[in-house]
Amino acid sequence: MSTKRNMKNENFVTFEVAKLLQDKGYREDCCASYITDETGRSELTVVFGVRKFRHLSIYTRFQYEYLAPTLYAAQKWVRTKGKIHIVVELNKHGWYYRLYDTEELSLISQMDGYTDTFEKALNDGIKESLTYL
């Protein structure tokens, strides 16, 4: 059984973050994408192959299509492209993120408040890091 078949929505960036990533130049191959119809409703579609940026939105029934990388792939892309490392930590209040500059080894930003899952904190950290790119 392929590991891709076991992937859940929480393993991928949210629709909002997928749009921001694409606006910032994310063009890596993915196994998932968000599609929107003419009403603006979005849906995550996981394929058992690879979605390439140049092949997005070739189907006329979709208004827009956005690459949907895994949280890890997006985190790595931000670290590579933006020189920003996203750290997710846990304390008695919940999960939170911190952003570090990988060249100056300094704290850039950290989350105000907490979330109930690691995945939400990482997604929020990716979203925040994109404001620095």
Show the residue positions of the predicted features.
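A generic signature of intrinsically disordered, low-complexity regions enriched in glycine/proline
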Residues: S33, R41, L105, K120, ...
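Ampiphathic alpha-helical segments that act as solvent-exposed interaction surfaces
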Residues: M111-L133
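N-terminal segment of the canonical double-stranded RNA-binding domain
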Residues: K19, R27, R41-D116
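Extreme N-terminal leader/activation tails
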Residues: T3-E43
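Intrinsic-disorder/low-complexity regions
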Residues: R5-E10, T36, L90, Y100, ...
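Charged, low-complexity surface segments at secondary-structure and domain boundaries
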Residues: M1-N6, I58-F62
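Surface-exposed polar/charged interaction patches
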Residues: K24, T80-I84, E128, Y132
